[in-house]
């Protein structure tokens, strides 16, 4: 299973924010600069992360973005659930004539659930804790 770039960059943005000192604000421009992604794409990603409570956005002169809750409370599996369309196959009877007897959808759904269950073993904090090589790459001190 390959994650969409939307989810990929959502995770990267969260990792960047988690690598900052607790509560420190950053900007969408800073995140886009670090990862080399378009500002327009990142705005959409941050809006989605904000809608689901993973990011807090503050407007104004001293505004910016930061994690919506502590990094140790953000499960990687939950992020993927919030960002990723998890339907692997299109099983409508209009599309596929074997749908009434097909077992593939159930198998694929079980695989997705196993994938998410494994991701639930890790938090955003696990991605950044004691990871000085990451801090250097992100230019975070």
UniProtKB/Swiss-Prot annotation:
Alphabetical UniProt keywords: 2Fe-2S, DNA-binding, Iron, Iron-sulfur, Metal-binding, Repressor, Transcription, Transcription regulation
InterPro entries assigned to the protein according to its UniProt record, in alphabetical order: TR_Rrf2-type_CS (IPR030489), Tscrpt_reg_Rrf2 (IPR000944), Tscrpt_rep_HTH_NsrR (IPR023761), WH-like_DNA-bd_sf (IPR036388), WH_DNA-bd_sf (IPR036390)
Cofactor note (record): Binds 1 [2Fe-2S] cluster per subunit.
GO biological process: negative regulation of DNA-templated transcription; regulation of DNA-templated transcription
Example of a GO cellular component annotation carried by this entry: cytosol
DNA-binding positions: 28-51
HTH rrf2-type domain sequence ranges: 2-129
GO MF annotations in UniProt: 2 iron, 2 sulfur cluster binding; DNA-binding transcription factor activity; double-stranded DNA binding; iron ion binding
Binding site for [2Fe-2S] cluster: 91, 96, 102
Pfam families referenced in this protein's UniProt entry, alphabetically: Rrf2
PROSITE patterns: HTH_RRF2_1, HTH_RRF2_2
Keyword DNA-binding attributed: yes
Cofactor: [2Fe-2S] cluster
Signal peptide: none
Positions of disulphide bridges: none
Top-level taxon of origin: Bacteria
Function statement: Nitric oxide-sensitive repressor of genes involved in protecting the cell against nitrosative stress. May require iron for activity.
Name listed for the protein in its UniProt record: HTH-type transcriptional repressor NsrR
Species the sequence originates in: Yersinia pestis
